[in-house]
Amino acid sequence: MTLQEQIMKALHVQPVIDLKAEIRKRVDFLKDYVKKTGAKGFVLGISGGQDSTLAGRLAQLAVEEIRNEGGNATFIAVRLPYKVQKDEDDAQLALQFIQADQSVAFDIASTVDAFSNQYENLLDESLTDFNKGNVKARIRMVTQYAIGGQKGLLVIGTDHAAEAVTGFFTKFGDGGADLLPLTGLTKRQGRALLQELGADERLYLKMPTADLLDEKPGQADETELGITYDQLDDYLEGKTVPADVAEKIEKRYTVSEHKRQVPASMFDDWWK
């Protein structure tokens, strides 16, 4: 088995999917897991990007079905901007599409800035823009877990195969969640599911960005990665990509393995 095939298997990628069946099994997963845990529903941060829009809509479909079947579940969508978000209109469009039971907004700027200032005062150095970006992601995680803890809700994560293969998420930030309904999907498959669900094309054709950096606001994921999502998707779907691209992907996969594992102990083999 080639490394490409091993990665496809490890990340549960299916090169060809049936859109309706894929939506059905992911909604069922959300329903089954929330029932199994005894939680009261879900909470998820909504950025206006493809991934949170898709996960949010699946979550809302799941809680509506649970209620229609006589159960009780709710979904809270959370806006978590740092000051004014450049693409706030897209975030509002996503909320209109998702139709969450409840939407709340929590500006993380005061929390992030207070921490950054305290860090600088105590350690006599400023956080790099990259590390401050990770603080933003982790404050968003803390906020979602605070809401989840208060309301008895599970935190949904938006990680999918094209992010997982590169480790393109913040450890214990957007990587911190209770369940991952998008696991195994490539970026183009996620787009196709949103299209099948009737989302405005603006929500799945827009340029993907983590938007964590003050110095490079709205920087494209592809710029930061040095790899396009089409190249990642082709690789994950078993297609041939240029050798240098495959090498980049496989190197990122190897060095980011710690992000896909629980914290290492002396009894684990994965890090050796």
From Swiss-Prot:
It catalyses: deamido-NAD(+) + NH4(+) + ATP = AMP + diphosphate + NAD(+) + H(+). It comes from the Bacteria. Keywords: ATP-binding, Ligase, Magnesium, Metal-binding, NAD, Nucleotide-binding. Transmembrane segments: none annotated. Gene3D superfamilies: HUPs. Mg(2+) binds at D51, E163. Deamido-NAD(+) binds at R138, K171, D178, H258, K259. Its EC number is 6.3.1.5. One of its GO terms (cellular component) is cytoplasm. Pathway: Cofactor biosynthesis; NAD(+) biosynthesis; NAD(+) from deamido-NAD(+) (ammonia route): step 1/1. It holds the Pfam family NAD_synthase. GO terms for molecular function: ATP binding; glutaminase activity; metal ion binding; NAD+ synthase (glutamine-hydrolyzing) activity; NAD+ synthase activity. Homodimer. Catalyzes the ATP-dependent amidation of deamido-NAD to form NAD. Uses ammonia as a nitrogen source. Belongs to the NAD synthetase family. This is NH(3)-dependent NAD(+) synthetase. It comes from Bacillus thuringiensis subsp. konkukian (strain 97-27). The gene is nadE.
